Amino acid sequence: TAVGVALETGQTTGLLIGDIAFLHDSNGLIGLARRGADVRIVVVDNNGGGIFSFLPQRTSLPGGQFETIFGTPHESDASLIARAHGVRSCEARTTAELRQALAEVGPSVIVVKADRDKNVEHHDEIHRAVAEAVRGSIKV
């Protein structure tokens, strides 16, 4: 869809996508480099289905079953997949690197590595802070 938007509008278009979705949709990279679509694809690579780490099954399934069934680790390299299709790619390790990569004209795949467990912990911290703020502001 993002490639279609970029081609139809002629405008720079951004796409934020998870690694599993990127792998499923990587055929969209075919011919991208020669189409003239200025699309910047940012791949959040947590080596699997990070969204599923928020499910209760994460802590209730024995052993490595959760990883096998829901985590779906893949060990694929999104940058190599992009380059195989002639699309420029890089890994952004800092905010400055991400900004620099996003500023480059032309189609590109920018990979941002993430840790699934830390992502869940961070969301839990935010959830607790919001809940505390709401409780503090409601007089019951």
For each of these PLM feature ranges, what is it?
Residues 1-140:
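Thiamine diphosphate
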